[in-house]
Structure formats: C-alpha cells, structure tokens
Amino acid sequence: MFPGFRPSDHTDGERALFAAFVAAGLAGAWVTLIVTNRLLGEESLFFEFVSVHGLWNFIAGAIGTVSSIYLNRRWFGHEGLAGLRYAAGAILNTTFVATLIAGTFALPFYGTMFGPLAIVGTFWTSPAVLAIWLFVLAGVNLAYGVYRRERASVFEAKLPSETEVYFRRL
C-alpha cells in the first residue's frame, strides 16, 4: 500500500464508492471491448486484448465510465420513488455520456458518432451484457445511497429525549 494510506482510515460510504467506481470502470472497459470488437466483426463476449489497440480500448472504456458516473453523481443515491426516477435517468444519462467519452478516446470522431448507436445494438443483441451493465450501475446507485446517508448523518440534529431531566416540563 501507499505510505499513510489505510483502508481503515476511510468511512463505509467512501469505501463503497471506491468499490463501485472500480467495478463500474472494469464493467465499462469490458463493454467497450465488446462494442469495439463487434464493430470490427468479432462476436465474442470473452477475449484477450493482445494489441495496443485492445489495451487502449480497455483504458478508454474505464475512463469513460468512471468520468460519466462522476459527472452524473448528483442523480445517484436518492431515496424513495423520486430516487428511483433519478436513478433511472442517471443510468440512461451515464450510459450515453460514457459511450461518448469512451468512443471519443477509443476511435476519435467515428467512436463519438457511432458509440451510442453501437452500445444500443450491443445491448439489443446481448441481453446478458445489458443485465451486467444495469446491475453494476444499480450497485453504483446503492453505493451513493450509503455515501449520502453517511454524509447526511453528520448534520442530523440530536434532540434530547423526554426522559432526560433538563427536558421535563415543570
């Protein structure tokens, strides 16, 4: 580890966010490799990236996904029915922005234009990829929920109970 860095120094919400960002980055990198391989005519869900191009697509997918989640962070982690609506919008927007960013890095201009279309085609033909993507982004939503509740608990007012002596009515 790094000197001065211990996982125990961080709160549960921060650790949950870190795990969610790592999982989403890996899932986004994997989906990016699937999409770019399908654009090249290969239909495999599991493969080895042995070229510099494959490695760069992997990195571009991770960067695109993590930065897209960061840009949409205000919509993740809310409670209730409104939180469910926010999460659905965040998942759609995160998917779109991630394809724009990763597509621009992976294949400039071509990837920017056809990235969103290619991801829709990939999700349409491979429901397993869509299910994994939605599962990971639902995990991001849960992690942001833990983080938001943790941050909100810092500012909760501690009201005295009626059993305490100085609170009783005279």
Predicted regions and their residues:
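Juxtamembrane/disordered regions of integral membrane proteins
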Residues: 1-170
